Design a protein with these regions (language model features):
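Short beta-to-alpha transition helix within the HATPase_c
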Residues: 1-11
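A short, flexible helix-to-loop-to-beta junction within the catalytic ATP-binding CA
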Residues: 8, 44-52
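Conserved short strand/loop->alpha-helix "switch" segment adjacent to the catalytic nucleotide/phosphoryl-transfer site
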Residues: 15-35
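Short beta-strand/loop element within the Bergerat-fold HATPase_c
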Residues: 54-66
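Glycine-rich/acidic phosphate-handling loop/turn and adjacent ATP-lid/helix
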Residues: 66-100
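Glycine-rich nucleotide-binding loop
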Residues: 78, 122-129
Length: 136
């Protein structure tokens, strides 16, 4: 996560974060790193399409009602790419066959751990909320 936050700062993205991992989350470190890495890559990509004065990133990772909440919100130009099935795609590559790979991986991890995900693609802000059940 440190490398991604450094990349965001290098790209003049203003960052607000609140990060607190409870002891009783049950997501493997590898899956958690993959999930956060993909989310931050998408947020940084979206911000880099904007004027430097509009670049914002908000990260919240914390316990919430017996769940682990991951919330990522970033500035956006409001232009989104959707696949034939209506799913959001990312555009980090010019190869159309590779669009949406990160989002596919995010969805796989959420499903693997019985989580819930919600994408909110708005005009100036894009946000992702993910909830995972915590162990008792």
């Amino acid at each position: 996560m440190t490398a991604k936050l450094s990349k965001a700062l290098d790209n003049n993205i203003s960052i607000k974060h609140q990060i607190h991992f409870p002891a009783n989350y049950n997501i493997s470190d590898m899956d958690l790193c993959s999930l956060i890495s993909n989310l931050l890559d998408n947020a940084i990509e979206a911000n880099c399409k904007l004027d430097m004065t509009k670049r914002r990133l908000q990260i919240e990772i914390k316990p919430y009602n017996n769940m682990l909440l991951l919330f990522i919100s970033n500035s956006s130009n409001g232009i989104y790419l959707y696949g034939g099935n209506g799913n959001l795609l990312t555009t980090k590559t010019s190869n159309k066959n590779e669009h949406g790979i990160g989002i596919k991986r995010i969805n796989e991890i959420v499903k693997k751990y019985n989580g819930i995900i919600e994408f909110d693609p708005a005009t100036e802000i894009f946000s992702v909320s993910i909830l995972f059940p915590l162990d008792n």
